[in-house]
Structure formats: C-alpha cells, structure tokens
Amino acid sequence: MRLYVVQMFYSSLKESGALVAEARNTVAALSKKDFVLMGFGEHTAAIAFASTEPEANMRAQFERIRGENFSLIAFEAAWIVGGSMSKEVSLWLERHQPSPFK
C-alpha cells in the first residue's frame, strides 16, 4: 500500500470550499474513506491517505480539480515522513505502515 499526500493551496477556504470538498471526496473514494485531513493555516490544507492505486492513476484523478486561485499537488510520500507530523497523523500512519515481515 502506498502513502499519498494531496496538498491544496487557495486564497480563501470560503472561495475554494467546493474544490477542497471535491478533493476530499476523491480521496475518500481512493482510500475507502480512511484518510487524515491536515490544516496548515488559512491558505493551505493537505490530506494524507493510503491506497493501492498506482500513482499515475491517482494523480490523473486529481488533475481535473482546477479553479481560480486554487492549486493542488498530489504525490507519493515516504512512510518515514510520519515522525514529524501531528499525533493524529502519526497514529494514522502507524496503523497503515507496511510490515517489514510480510
């Protein structure tokens, strides 16, 4: 299972709320509704999720989410990134981290 992060940048959440919701709904479908929403201030948010979907297929689904004063990047992240995240995100990552014994 791969760890993905979708990071969104916008001028205001009020203005871009529908696009953020569309990104969240796409993540929910890809992750079977198992994801963590992270806020990084009033102009950016990110969603971490695990999925078996290949990166190219996942990225293609997010490329269609576009809007004025809104941008989004989606990428595969390393499992090691969890140690520097909030407790909620670290616990979620720990639950999904692949076992080295499988």
Residue ranges and their predicted role:
Residues 17-25, 56, 60, 80, ...:
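Long, contiguous binding/interaction regions
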Residues 81-102:
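Short, low-order "capping/linker" segments at domain edges
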Residues 11-33:
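Short amphipathic alpha-helix segments
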Residues 24-29, 66-69, 91-95:
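Short, low-complexity, polar/charged sequence segments that are solvent-exposed and flexible
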Residues 1-12:
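Short glycine-/aliphatic-rich beta-strand segments at the starts of folded cytosolic domains
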Residues 29-71, 75-78:
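Short, intrinsically disordered low-complexity segments
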